[in-house]
Curated annotation (Swiss-Prot):
Cellular compartments annotated: Nucleus, Nucleoplasm
UniProt record similarity statement: Belongs to the RNA 3'-terminal cyclase family. Type 1 subfamily.
Binding positions for ATP per the UniProt entry: Q104, P131, Y294, D297, Q298, H320
UniProt-recorded name of the protein: RNA 3'-terminal phosphate cyclase
Enzyme Commission designation: 6.5.1.4
PANTHER family xref list: RNA 3' TERMINAL PHOSPHATE CYCLASE (PTHR11096), RNA 3'-TERMINAL PHOSPHATE CYCLASE (PTHR11096:SF0)
Main location: nucleus
Source species of the chain: Macaca fascicularis
Gene3D superfamilies: RNA 3'-terminal phosphate cyclase domain, RNA 3'-terminal phosphate cyclase, insert domain
Function noted in UniProt: Catalyzes the conversion of 3'-phosphate to a 2',3'-cyclic phosphodiester at the end of RNA. The mechanism of action of the enzyme occurs in 3 steps: (A) adenylation of the enzyme by ATP; (B) transfer of adenylate to an RNA-N3'P to produce RNA-N3'PP5'A; (C) and attack of the adjacent 2'-hydroxyl on the 3'-phosphorus in the diester linkage to produce the cyclic end product. Likely functions in some aspects of cellular RNA processing. Function plays an important role in regulating axon regeneration by inhibiting central nervous system (CNS) axon regeneration following optic nerve injury.
Record's keyword terms, sorted: ATP-binding, Ligase, Nucleotide-binding, Nucleus
Cross-referenced HAMAP family: RTC
Length: 366
């Protein structure tokens, strides 16, 4: 099964955990042995952190692969994949490391397994420097399912920084191939909704204040739509630790979804958290694209694997997206073209089309 070994420099471009996620997922899918060097070389704490390690171990277990050099602080790993299998797989960051990032690395792999999979992912569900689980369920899920598969995400417990302790269970069945997607028509915004949550000891007033501040901020720019942000107190038995945050979604007439989100920190007042999320959403609505800045890079691996040409329209192409494209081209040999959008209404905006000729990956087990 093994092809020639792929050599990856983990310090280039985004230079972080994303390079590991993209390269190990593609290595696993394509049966290519992989060596990643200089892992997170430029970061303040270089090398593997607990959440990266749990992701690597999970991919190893998904395919009965061999993994060397995988320990906290290690800056070099080698990975030799075998056949991807379904069944129940568990990954636990044992920290507030993001369960959503564990999903990012494992999901493309289990789509090409021999049988249905159930992923038990433990860590932070609403953590910094990663999508919140609400984003994954409300934005990522409906869009990524356009590639022609379905998954179920059951949030058992929410976990926050610094303790983690959250758990989600993801269930999905394998596919024969992925369909290409074409997301180039934004349409107009028809709905804005969201949730502002508090968990643990934080008073419910914090959730109400975040929601109210966000609504006021959005109203300044969008006056003709009802903005429905629900304040929520997470049930005690479904949340571990204390936390607060907000996610706001805008939905368009063509089914595009955009989000703005923010998490509370000690000493930051609730209004500021709400306004930060609202401003992020508004910025994502200004650029004319069909996906927000956080969805861009999460679609690249699926576009690379799909059978045909995919197109998405984006705002400014993020470094994460450029990095994902670089490794999808290097490892999977997919072909990407990124060009400025030519549409009349996009002329004044920083809007791009990312086009990919996918490799038409076929599940050998089906």
């Amino acid at each position: 099964m093994a092809g020639p070994r792929v050599e990856v420099d983990g310090s280039i471009m985004e230079g972080g955990g994303q390079i590991l996620r993209v390269s190990t997922a593609l290595s696993c899918l394509l049966g290519l042995p992989l060596r990643v060097q200089k892992i997170r070389a430029g970061r303040s704490t270089p090398g593997l952190r607990p959440q990266h390690l749990s992701g690597l171990e999970m991919i190893r277990d998904l395919c009965d692969g061999r993994l060397e050099g995988a320990e906290i602080g290690s800056t070099e790993i080698t990975f030799t994949p075998e056949k991807i299998k379904g069944g129940i797989h568990t990954a636990d960051t044992k920290t507030a490391g993001s369960v959503c990032l564990l999903m990012q690395v494992s999901m493309p792999c289990v789509l090409f397994a021999a049988s249905p999979s159930e992923l038990h992912l433990k860590g932070g569900t609403n953590a910094e420097m990663a999508p919140q689980i609400d984003y994954t369920v409300m934005v990522f899920k409906p869009i990524v399912e356009k590639f022609g598969f379905r998954f179920n995400c059951d949030i058992k417990t929410r976990g926050y920084y610094p303790k983690g302790g959250g758990e989600v269970i993801v269930r999905m069945s394998p596919v024969k191939q992925l369909n290409p997607i074409n997301l180039t028509d934004r349409g107009c915004v028809t709905k804005i909704y969201g949730r502002a949550f508090v968990a643990g000891v934080l008073p419910f007033k914090v959730a109400k204040d975040m929601a109210a501040a966000a609504v006021r901020c959005i109203r300044k720019e969008i006056r003709d739509l009802y903005v429905n942000i629900q304040p929520v107190q997470e049930p005690k038995d479904q949340a571990f630790g204390n936390g607060n945050g907000i996610i706001i979604i805008a939905e368009t007439s063509t089914g595009c979804l955009f989000a703005g989100s923010s998490l509370g920190k000690r000493g930051v007042n609730a209004d500021k958290v709400g306004i930060e999320a609202a401003e992020m959403l508004l910025a994502n609505l200004r650029h004319g694209g069909t996906v927000d800045e956080y969805l861009q890079d999460q679609l690249i691996v699926f576009m690379a694997l799909a059978n045909g040409v995919s197109r998405i329209k984006t705002g400014p192409v993020t470094l994460h997206t450029q990095t994902a494209i670089h490794f999808a081209e290097q490892i999977a040999k997919a072909k990407f073209i990124v060009k400025k959008s030519e549409d009349e209404e996009d002329a004044s905006k920083d809007t791009y089309i990312i086009e990919c000729q996918g490799i038409g990956m076929t599940n050998p087990n089906l």
